[in-house]
Amino acid sequence: MGKRLYAVAYDIPDDTRRVKLANLLKSYGERVQLSVFECYLDERLLEDLRRRARRLLDLGQDALRIYPVAGQVEVLGVGPLPELREVQVL
């Protein structure tokens, strides 16, 4: 299966964890709102993102939501659609 677009949103009250998660998500996609990223992921990258995010999150306080985007994305206002780019996880 190829890459598909996901919207990844988070709500994290702790500044340190929030910054760490945002930095992690920057390596997978593009920030489109303060706490929302758009990421093109295949199954391997999606599982890698989940695994790495679990290490950063406090599951009793934090929320991370990963939404697969079906169909075309429409943008009203400013902001381009995310580009499909090659992601390398080290």
Swiss-Prot record:
One of its GO terms (molecular function) is metal ion binding. Keywords: Antiviral defense, Endonuclease, Hydrolase, Magnesium, Metal-binding, Nuclease, Plasmid. Mg(2+) binds at D11. Its EC number is 3.1.-.-. Belongs to the CRISPR-associated endoribonuclease Cas2 protein family. CRISPR (clustered regularly interspaced short palindromic repeat), is an adaptive immune system that provides protection against mobile genetic elements (viruses, transposable elements and conjugative plasmids). CRISPR clusters contain sequences complementary to antecedent mobile elements and target invading nucleic acids. CRISPR clusters are transcribed and processed into CRISPR RNA (crRNA). Involved in the integration of spacer DNA into the CRISPR cassette. Functions as a dsDNA endonuclease and as a weak ssRNase. This is CRISPR-associated endonuclease Cas2 2. It comes from Thermus thermophilus (strain ATCC BAA-163 / DSM 7039 / HB27).
